[in-house]
Amino acid sequence: GATNHGLVMFFDWSGSMQYNLTQTLKQLYNLVWFCDRVKIPYRVYAFSDAYEGAPSYSRVVSEEILVTQNPDNKSDLDVSGFRLIEMFSDKMRKNETADMMHYWYMMGEYYGGYRNWRDNGYPMQPPKNLHLGGTPLNHAIVAAMSIIPSFKTKNGIQKVNAVFLTDGVSHAVTRKISGEDINGYNKESYITDKITNTTITSDTKNSRYYSGEKQTTILLQLLKKR
């Protein structure tokens, strides 16, 4: 039944999405309404690297901030330069969801050059933390490997689908927590998921860069095995 399923969604809040934000938000809202209608647990996160202040493992200032990595695992991919911002969840009341849908949509209209203010409401100038930046899709996939199993356990469900609403190519995760660079000319790169004991090697021979796109493919394969 529906109660055995859940949905975790990740929304690309980046500069390349500027003129596609409102249309993509409409797609997102349809998914949220579907989850509410069939009563399945869900979470929606925006991913961004423009959030004010570099995230710090040693300076978590609020219980509302969840760190998905252990900084002592020096060989792990370092995805500390981005944030996930929770947009929606099944824990919100109906009026809270409606209000937040309006606020996110008005911010999308602001970036899209919206003009018909009188009839449909005024666009909102986004707060500094929600300015558009790069596309840390790969960073979000790495975080999802912690978030989705935890979400599954907390909700007592068997199957969780992940949805990534994005338009473009991610920039690569280029270093380990130790600071070691994983990018280089003619250098074979591989990523190991120690939980599932799966290693996937990227085809980077004779290629100058370990591209974000190749890394996305590897990370999605690893996420699927979770």
Language model feature labels by segment:
Residues 1-226:
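Acidic, glycine-rich A-domain
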